[in-house]
UniProtKB/Swiss-Prot annotation:
The keyword Transferase does not apply. It comes from Acidobacterium capsulatum (strain ATCC 51196 / DSM 11244 / BCRC 80197 / JCM 7670 / NBRC 15755 / NCIMB 13165 / 161). Transmembrane segments: none annotated. PANTHER family: 30S RIBOSOMAL PROTEIN S12 FAMILY MEMBER. This is Small ribosomal subunit protein uS12.
Length: 131
């Protein structure tokens, strides 16, 4: 325990905050180019083929990003926008692709939660406006 005079001289150091998405370097999103698009299997209790992409960002860092939603059009050299947010059952995947921006199209036939997947509003008749 420090003495009072030691605290006057140096003060207490505040604990350093460790960011969950260091490659963004404080930005909300960042642009990058897909270097590889592939599928990955999740951790133990789950079973699937999750769609992921290796992306080289504009700051030179290369990260693994998750492609959310059903179906995508991404391939090598596609330009994507990424945001933070990890995927719990994919180790090392700490970023998400933002759907509906740059080369990534929105999810087709999406009715609910459309803003998360870059889907436009359906042009249906009376049923589209009412619940």
């Amino acid at each position: 325990m420090p003495t009072f005079s030691q605290l006057v001289r140096k003060g207490r150091t505040a604990p350093r905050y460790k960011t969950a998405s260091p490659a963004l370097q404080g930005s909300p999103q960042r642009r990058g180019v897909c270097t590889r698009v592939y599928t990955q299997t999740p951790k133990k209790p789950n079973s699937a083929l999750r769609k992921v992409a290796r992306v080289r960002l504009t700051n030179g860092i290369e990260v693994t990003t998750y492609i959310p939603g059903i179906g995508h059009n991404l391939q090598e050299h596609s330009i994507v926008l990424i945001r933070g947010g990890r995927v719990k059952d994919l180790p090392g995947v700490r970023y998400h692709v933002v759907r509906g921006t740059l080369d990534s199209v929105g999810v087709a036939n999406r009715k609910q939660g459309r803003s998360k997947y870059g889907a436009k509003r359906a042009k249906g008749g009376a049923a589209a406006g009412k619940k």
